[in-house]
Amino acid sequence: LKILVVIPVFNESKHILKCLQSFYEQSYKNIDWILVNDSSTDNSKEIIEEFIKDKPTFGLTNLINSSEHVPGAKVVKTFYAGLNSVNWKQYDVLVKLDADIILPENYFELIVNELQNNPKIGIIGGLVYIKKGNQWVYENISNKNHVRGPIKTYRKECFIDIGGLRMTLGWDNLDILLARMHHWEVKVLKNLFVKHLKPTAYVYQETKSRKLGEYFYNIGLSKKLAFISCAKSSWKEKSLRHFIISFKTFISLEKEKKERVITQEEMNFIRKFRWNEMIKKFKR
C-alpha cells in the first residue's frame, strides 16, 4: 500500500526535529511525506528545509498569510493545501498527522498490516499518550475507541466516500460518523502508542462549553439530543454553568440557522446513530 502523509505545521520549532526523525525512521518505507508550513513565525520552516534537503520522499509547501480563524477549519484547510499539492488519488492510504507527534518505528507497518488483513477498515490509528512527570500516560480527552485528530489514517476509498474532511469544528468526529454511515469500520490499535509532545490545550471553561454547543450543532443534533448530550457533559464536568453555556450556544446557532457542512441525509443518519448509541448505553 502506498501512503501519503500530510502534516500541518505552525510554530513547532521546539518539537519538529524529533518528530521528523521518527517519521523518517519508519520501518515501512512506501510513504511520501508533505509538510505544510502555515505561515509559522518561528524557524520551523528552516528546520524542515534543512532536514528534508537530502530526503526525496519529504516535501514542503509554504502557505503565506493564512487568515482562516474558524475553529477546526484552519487545520483542515492547511491539510488540503498539502493534499492538493500532489495527485493524491494515486495513493492507497491518506494520513493527517500533527507536527508534535512522535511515532514508534513500526507505526505504519502495523497500520498497513491491519488495513491489508481487513478491507472493511476505513479509519485507523493508535492511542495518544502525553508525558506526566517521568511517565507517558494516555491523554484522556476521548474514549479509547476514537481515532484522534492528531493521528488520522484513512483508506482512500473511505476518504472519498465521506466527502473528505469538513472545514468545521468537530471535523475529527464527523469523519468517523460519516465513515460508519458508509459502512466502514473504525479501528483503534490499543497496543500502539504515539507520543504527543504538546498536549491538547485546555481552554477557559466558558470557551470549552461554547465549543461543545457549537460542535453539537455542527454535527446536526436535534434539540432533544443536544439537551441530553449537554446535560451528560455537564454531569461529567460537575458544572451546571457548563450545561447552560453549551446548550444556550446550541440554541442560538439553531435560531440564526447557521449553515452546516453536512447534508440532510448525513444529519438524519447522525441523529439516528446517536439515539441508538444512547439507548445501548442506557440498557447496559
What role is predicted for each listed range?
Residues N37-E46, S66, I101:
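A conserved acidic beta->alpha catalytic loop
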Residues S67, I102-Y138:
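Conserved donor NDP-sugar-binding/catalytic core segment of glycosyltransferases
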Residues Q90-I102:
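Short beta-strand-to-loop acidic/aromatic patch adjacent to the donor-nucleotide binding site
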